[in-house]
């Protein structure tokens, strides 16, 4: 018990040397006695086994007033407001600028609602010749076939009269008939070609194109009658 009471008394009332000794020393100023005297009177009032800290707490409003009154010295620049810790008061930072595309790249066009603009597909000439009649019967294609000319009865009658007198037409006569019957020169030419083929078939005449090709392939057919004729004259 005696030892514990001694320790408690030493903690509660610490003993310091007299102030005169500190005043005589060279490393302490004149404020030593006042400092230690005030500390003994106010700070060292303990309630328990352990000493109380010397930290003096200040009220929140007083600390805020002192913090607002003190301003750092600057070169005429106003101090910016402290950042707010609330998300509602924070200012929205501007978004970074979009990168500029290079010359070889084209930016993709977008609609106002965010959907990409659909560009028309490129159709090449060789793509138009695809047979799509089975898929879409209304599609005529890029190069539709020429429709057959439907001759009227009056036109056919006039062409038959001309064919009866002349099976082959000259260029001038063909142009005259085309202007008279309101037809093209090509239509007159095709009609006469078809009519001659029909006439040869009706009269069972050989085709002139086939005969000329066969004679060109066998040139000895023309020389044989000539040799035979010479032989007869010699006799």
From Swiss-Prot:
Protein name: Homeobox protein Hox-D4
Primary location group: nucleus
Record's compositionally biased regions (Polar residues): 209-221
DNA-binding region residue numbers: 144-203
One BP term from GO: embryonic skeletal system morphogenesis
One GO molecular-function entry: RNA polymerase II cis-regulatory region sequence-specific DNA binding
Keywords on record: Developmental protein, DNA-binding, Homeobox, Nucleus, Transcription, Transcription regulation
GO cellular component: nucleoplasm
InterPro entries tied to this protein: Antp_homeobox_Deformed_sf, HD, HD_metazoa, Homeobox_antennapedia, Homeobox_Antennapedia_CS, Homeobox_CS, Homeodomain-like_sf
Keyword DNA-binding: yes
Role, per record: Sequence-specific transcription factor which is part of a developmental regulatory system that provides cells with specific positional identities on the anterior-posterior axis. Binds to sites in the 5'-flanking sequence of its coding region with various affinities. The consensus sequences of the high and low affinity binding sites are 5'-TAATGA[CG]-3' and 5'-CTAATTTT-3'.
Motif Antp-type hexapeptide per UniProt: ranges: 123-128
Protein location: Nucleus
Annotated region described as Disordered, given as residue ranges: 66-93, 202-235
Compositionally biased tracts (Basic and acidic residues): 225-235
Family of the protein in this entry: Belongs to the Antp homeobox family. Deformed subfamily.
